[in-house]
């Protein structure tokens, strides 16, 4: 009986520590989701502002090109639809989100074009991407319990973003900026979806459907 009483403080301390870790983990998820939501809204606004400066024919042509083209981040293997997203583990969604954010560290610096609003936004984006990357890395560390499990595709290096956009051809800055902004908006939407699902799973909510 004495041994049971001796173990009680240890068990209670362990319970409180576990509860504290869960609360901190949820706090980090809340911050990460909030930040990527802001980035997604910012990306949407920047794309809409740029799209609004195009002539109708120019807009249609660029949209057709973009639909046939691809974003460099498409090299990152990720869920193809909502069903696959919901089947993916929390750790997998976090790793994909980390890779997507990391893939924009360089190109976010090239979003600066001849518009004062976009210059300010671009500076904000670089800082927010860096903060979000650190936050996702903390979530990965807290979710993997010391075991790093990556698919073979996760170890592949993406080709340099700069080289890709330097080879777009004679259309110049208009197509380059259109694709940058469209891809950025697309990828921030992906990360927002993945982090929202991962956060829901960690909170043990009954319904995490998209």
UniProtKB/Swiss-Prot annotation:
Keywords: Disulfide bond, Hormone, Metal-binding, Secreted, Signal, Zinc. The keyword Metal-binding applies. GO terms for biological process: animal organ development; calcium ion homeostasis; growth hormone receptor signaling pathway; hyperosmotic salinity response; magnesium ion homeostasis; positive regulation of growth; positive regulation of phagocytosis; positive regulation of receptor signaling pathway via JAK-STAT. Pfam families: Hormone_1 (PF00103). PROSITE patterns: SOMATOTROPIN_1, SOMATOTROPIN_2. It comes from the Eukaryota. This is Somatotropin-1. It comes from Oncorhynchus nerka (Sockeye salmon).
